[in-house]
């Protein structure tokens, strides 16, 4: 019993000493809160900031804080696509564009139907002029040029060849063809010209030979009405001649109009 009471009395004594600690007996040393508050800066700073604030110069050169990228949500619009709408009205036609390059030639089409016959045309006027004459007598050169005359007519349409002068006179402006055939004389030259008006155009020539031969010459000439064409034997500066006889015709002169031209 004594022991119990003694312990109780001891507990009361310890309580008296501990109460000042519990209720905060004032002391001269600062409390924990006062100590922390005294060390805090006047301005609010983050724990990672440096102790000294940046000077204005340092502020200009300071690296800006990292900017977080903007995050935009992606929406799959295809899942929101609706049904196809009706066709809208046509717009105003634009200006015509530039002409393009010519395309390639297409394939040939099918043959069309036969057309109707046209009205009859006016009758065309056809002009003719032709002659062919021959000589059955031989001829020798003389002191002057000799006009070759003919004694046989094969063709002479409209009498354009004058048998008296041995000349063909052109009735129309156009292109004409002429040909001359002769038989040379043994041991003599054959020297003959086809002459247009008074100008020798072409020559028919054969050298002297012990054998006689046939020679020919031809030419085309443009003529106007009144022009004349004839055959001339060269004068006696050379021993010259052409052969023929009464049995056969060795010498012929022919010509005809190829194409008439408008006057």
Curated annotation (Swiss-Prot):
Write out the annotated subcellular location: Secreted
* Segments of this protein annotated with the region Disordered: 80-123
What Gene Ontology molecular function terms does this protein carry? identical protein binding
What InterPro entries does its record include? Answer: C1q_dom (IPR001073), Collagen (IPR008160), Collagen/C1q_domain (IPR050392), Tumour_necrosis_fac-like_dom (IPR008983)
PROSITE patterns, per the entry: C1Q
Residue ranges of domain C1q in the record: 124-263
The keyword Transit peptide appears for this protein: no
Main location per the UniProt record: secreted
Signal sequence, renumbered to the chain: 1-24
Keyword tags: Collagen, Glycoprotein, Secreted, Signal
* Name assigned to this protein: Complement C1q tumor necrosis factor-related protein 6
List glycan-bearing residues.
76
Q: Looking at the record's lineage, which domain of life comes first?
A: Eukaryota
Q: Which Pfam families match?
A: C1q, Collagen
One GO term describing the cellular component: extracellular space
**Record's keyword annotation contains Glycoprotein:** yes
Residue ranges of every copy of the Collagen-like domain listed in the record: 82-123
Look up and give the organism this protein is from: Rattus norvegicus
């Amino acid at each position: 019993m004594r022991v119990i009471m003694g312990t109780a009395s001891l507990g009361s004594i310890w309580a008296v000493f501990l109460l000042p600690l519990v209720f905060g007996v004032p002391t001269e040393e600062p409390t924990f809160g006062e100590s922390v508050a005294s060390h805090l800066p006047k301005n609010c700073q983050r724990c990672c900031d440096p102790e000294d604030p940046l000077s204005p110069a340092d502020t200009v050169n300071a690296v800006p804080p990292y900017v977080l990228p903007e995050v935009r949500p992606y929406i799959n619009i295809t899942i929101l696509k609706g049904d196809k709408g009706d066709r809208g009205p046509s717009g105003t036609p634009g200006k015509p564009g530039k002409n393009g390059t010519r395309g390639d030639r297409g394939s040939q089409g099918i043959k069309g139907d036969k057309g109707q016959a046209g009205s009859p045309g006016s009758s065309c006027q056809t002009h003719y002029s032709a002659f062919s004459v021959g000589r059955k007598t031989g001829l020798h050169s003389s002191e002057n040029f000799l006009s070759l005359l003919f004694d046989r007519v094969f063709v002479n349409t409209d009498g354009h060849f004058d048998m008296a002068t041995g000349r063909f006179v052109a009735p129309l402006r156009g292109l004409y063809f002429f040909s001359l055939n002769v038989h040379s004389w043994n041991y003599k030259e054959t020297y003959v010209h086809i002459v247009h008006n008074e100008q020798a155009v072409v020559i028919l020539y054969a050298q002297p030979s012990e054998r006689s031969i046939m020679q020919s010459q031809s030419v085309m000439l443009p003529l106007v009405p009144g022009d004349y064409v004839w055959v001339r034997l060269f004068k006696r500066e050379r021993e010259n001649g052409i052969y023929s006889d009464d049995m056969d015709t060795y010498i012929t002169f022919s010509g005809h109009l190829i194409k008439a031209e408008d006057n």
